[in-house]
Amino acid sequence: MRGLATHPAARGLADDCAVLDLGSESLVLTHDTLVEGIHFLPGQDPADVAWKLVATNLSDLAAKGAEPLGVLLGYQLGTDDPRFVAGLDEVLSHYGVSLLGGDTVGAAGPQVLGLTALGRATHRPVPSRAGSRHGDRIWITGPVGAALLGLEALQAGDGESTAYRRPQALLAQGWALAPFVTAMMDVSDGLLLDASRMALASCVTFAIEQASVPIATPEARRDDALRWGDDYQLLFTLPGNHESPVPANCIGIVHERGPAPLLLDGKPPSGKLGYEH
Amino acid sequence: MRGLATHPAARGLADDCAVLDLGSESLVLTHDTLVEGIHFLPGQDPADVAWKLVATNLSDLAAKGAEPLGVLLGYQLGTDDPRFVAGLDEVLSHYGVSLLGGDTVGAAGPQVLGLTALGRATHRPVPSRAGSRHGDRIWITGPVGAALLGLEALQAGDGESTAYRRPQALLAQGWALAPFVTAMMDVSDGLLLDASRMALASCVTFAIEQASVPIATPEARRDDALRWGDDYQLLFTLPGNHESPVPANCIGIVHERGPAPLLLDGKPPSGKLGYEH
């Protein structure tokens, strides 16, 4: 968050979620904005947009091992509001989450949709990006690249696009993992970029073996899959001798901090690592 | 919130704030969106916009007697982001509130800014709009119409515009009032409209005496002052024999529900009561 992140009060903006202790509970809070033409396609089904808006915020809670308490919506009226409401209904029911409040505005220009999700931590300390240690192993809950294929199918008007349109928030996996992980985050902007961020936050170097990363694309597009976002798998580290309590793939190991935060098959990857905001 | 308000999960949208019990605490949550050209003037000082965005949400918390815990910001980049940050810093420092998180997006079109404010109730049950009873007296914490004069001064480029640019959230008043009020809300959309909403929510009729309403405008503009918004005074009802624990003016009494929710000097007011979203 340019400019704002330098503000002493704005430290929370560097991470996806804020954690706030309140009485006997720890609250986990996240806010994301989707903009038409940037985060979703103009003309995309508003029901899918509603799904994505909610699911991506819940995914942030999943990465904190948090149980959702509800969401607040900042809704800019669009071309088919009833269809948005239908999708909102579907995603809220699917995750058993309440719409606690929000507001509606009319405005010209691309549709801007904001959502705040609120959860309670199921385990404390709440996992962050900053706990990976030398000797940990790096894990991911499932393949990357499915959303990339889904977007291409949607743009082509042909083929399976669910992974792009209706991402899943891995809440149950996050709850199961929270007591054991040394660090955790959801992969929203590309595996290489997000892994690099986690390594930087933890002051370590991540060494990832390309071939061990599960991908949803053909092998020829492995590199795209590792740099594409929107899959919302959980990326986490566990002490070296721990197995994952949920199905997951070990994709590398954590070293002491070297010259580069990320090594791919032993070398710093070149080019764009993912989707930079 | 058209469409959404009919959703069973969307009941919270009918009120300004959501209240959520969590452990030993009650959380109070509100989300408001400001749109350039609708809620603030194009070209208005971004520092003032930041102030208003935060203060209006904190005002919602004030009306619930809630103590702010922090805010989350959905920020669409504008023409002078450092100036926005300066105003944000100022308002957060003024109220001692933390920026917990949020995100930044770039988009064409008018600037859309969303803010979620989170607080903890200082008194339970948390005051709502729906508790006014026959025999209560109706109170307001201060004059209406100052923001109207401020807007006019700002548009004219001459005169005192602080009341419009930098509204105050009456947090201390809200905390002091919460244990005693039968209903409370902040006046954001015009006194007559908001009073009518409170009466409807409480299933009663409010009888307001025009002359007893404190106004910041000349007497000739009393009618404007009663219908204009943006002043963020607290409107509340107390049992008939109670005096207000904070400086406030008694402006009327509560009757059993009659044919109209609101009477002004004994008659239902005609015309537009305030700012309808």
Language-model features: where?
Chain A
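Internal active-site segments that recognize and position negatively charged phosphoryl groups
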Residues: 133-142, 166-191
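Glycine-/charge-enriched secondary-structure boundary and capping motifs
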Residues: 77-100, 105-113, 118-121, 179-180, ...
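Short, compositionally biased
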Residues: 146-166
